[in-house]
């Protein structure tokens, strides 16, 4: 939510990429009021309003300041990579260097949750809060995940021709799938997240700064 908070209250910001924190909280109630166990990763000052919505439902909060992110040390590399192999800045206010660092942490967060398995469950799903916004165009999808699948399930986003080279692909903000949702059984999730983290670090070393969607 960093970029949304940064731009909140400022004029001339498109609603497709930016919404107020109040809008996020209001539109996410339907999701947050489900009885399923949640592990919520957020900035420290967002725990209170999120906890108020969750009530006594099983919930673990992971409050993390940016400088305490596991891969915070990768930010200088991302900054440098975007100078030499820049991505397409669809919305410059949102797609910043810090954004590319934060958005690629979701697989590490998911890996930690699946590894610890505090709620002793076989199934895991990552959901971006932004998915519940009407502007995302994804809010009304209902058949995201078939629980009987053994592989990781994700949402198809766009059908595009295969790029001619690696840089042509990684310079895009969007890939073939939406990065806001992925789900699966514990073993598949652990394999998927571990692989994405490894490949993301390798891609950074190659001089690119991919988004979560292009990594997926």
Question: What are the language-model segments listed below?
Answer:
Residues 1, 38-39:
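Hydrophobic targeting segments
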Residues 1-23:
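N-proximal low-complexity "stem/linker" segments adjacent to membrane-targeting elements
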Residues 21-37, 52-57:
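Short, acidic, metal-binding catalytic loop of nucleotide-sugar glycosyltransferases
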Residues 44-51, 163:
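Short, charged/polar "capping" segments at the starts of alpha-helices
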Residues 55-120:
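Active-site-proximal specificity loops/subdomain of glycosyltransferases
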Residues 98, 102-155:
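GT-A fold catalytic core of metal-dependent nucleotide-sugar glycosyltransferases
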Residues 131-137, 174-216:
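Catalytic core and acceptor-binding pocket of nucleotide-sugar-dependent glycosyltransferases
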Residues 152-167:
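Short beta-strand-to-loop element that shapes/binds the nucleotide-sugar donor at the catalytic cleft/hinge
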């Amino acid at each position: 939510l960093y970029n949304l908070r940064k731009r909140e209250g400022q004029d001339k910001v498109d609603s497709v990429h930016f919404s107020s924190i109040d809008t996020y909280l209001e539109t996410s109630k339907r999701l947050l009021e489900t009885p399923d166990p949640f592990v919520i990763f957020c900035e420290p000052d967002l725990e209170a309003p999120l906890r108020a919505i969750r009530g006594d439902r099983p919930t673990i909060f992971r409050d993390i300041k940016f400088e305490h992110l596991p891969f915070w040390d990768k930010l200088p590399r991302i900054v440098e990579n975007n100078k030499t192999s820049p991505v397409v800045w669809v919305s410059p206010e949102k797609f910043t260097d810090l954004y590319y660092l934060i958005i690629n942490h979701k697989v590490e967060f998911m890996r930690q949750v699946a590894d610890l398995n505090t709620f002793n469950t076989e199934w895991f799903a990552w959901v971006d809060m932004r998915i519940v916004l009407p502007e995302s165009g994804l809010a009304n999808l209902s058949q995201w995940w078939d629980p009987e699948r053994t592989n990781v399930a994700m949402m198809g986003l766009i059908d595009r021709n295969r790029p001619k080279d690696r840089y042509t692909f990684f310079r895009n903000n969007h890939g073939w799938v939406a990065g806001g949702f992925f789900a699966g059984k514990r073993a598949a999730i652990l394999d998927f997240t571990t692989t994405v983290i490894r490949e993301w670090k390798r891609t950074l070393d190659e001089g690119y700064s991919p988004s979560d969607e292009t990594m997926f």
